[in-house]
Amino acid sequence: MRLHELLEARMEPDQNFLAQIEEIVDDSIDEYQEFLEENNDVDDIDELESILNSNNVDELPIEFITDHNPRKDPDEWISAVADWTEKEGKFVTVYLHAKNLEGAYGPKTFKNILMRMLGHETIHWNQYDKMGAKVLNTYKSGYQKGVIKKAAGGTDRDLMRSYLRDPHELMAYAHDLAGEMKETENPEDALRNPEKYKAELPVYNRFREIFPPNSKQLRQLLKYTADYFKS
């Protein structure tokens, strides 16, 4: 599929995969709660990682890894990366940021963040399917291009601009943004006036830190967002 065709074809998350993962997450949250009750309510994110991975009895293409390094954003509990190789196919890696989760973890918030993030990453999976192996073998994402640019003397902002202007990311982040809008007090107004709700829309705010409101990237983001919002 050519890029312009991909841009016209909105991808959806892999609902079958998400349903299977949700069962794993629900079981793991219950098991981790038992661990907390037996350990004076003191978080151990390595234990949470172990529980999540051990409950993946069907060996779904996902792995949870605890990251003990500090993050720039103290509220970033989780990050995830979708990948594809010709040998292994599609896969997603989820990083649990221990320093941010310890003492802050809550089961409902954890699940909401994780499932939304996996929705984002499985949109990438479906994009990969449409692109095909021939394209993927030589494809460089916006993030990869940004890393190259930064290594050549660019800035963190250059990297982020390259990452967020990637058409694949615009689509996947639009799905996230639609979900955030639906959680506001007035979802329809948030869709019409996202500037008014910037404080409640982390995805929109992230893009606004890089792009002006009338930019091509913001317009495309909001176009996809409206489609996801109404679906």
For the regions a protein language model found, what residue spans apply to each?
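Proteolytic processing junctions in secreted/extracellular precursors
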Residues: L3-A9, E38, K150
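Compositionally biased low-complexity segments enriched in polar/charged residues
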Residues: M11-D26, E37-D43, I62, W84, ...
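Long, well-structured alpha-helical subdomains associated
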Residues: E22, S28-Y32, A151-S231
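Zn2+-dependent metallopeptidase catalytic core
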Residues: V25-E59
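Amphipathic, interaction-prone secondary-structure segments
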Residues: E49-D83
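Active-site scaffold of zinc-dependent metalloenzymes
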Residues: R71-I113, T122-D129
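Post-HEXXH active-site segment of zinc metalloproteases
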Residues: N112, Y128-S162
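Catalytic phosphate/metal-binding cores of nucleic-acid and nucleotide-processing enzymes, i.e., regions
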Residues: M117, T122-W125, M131-T138, M181
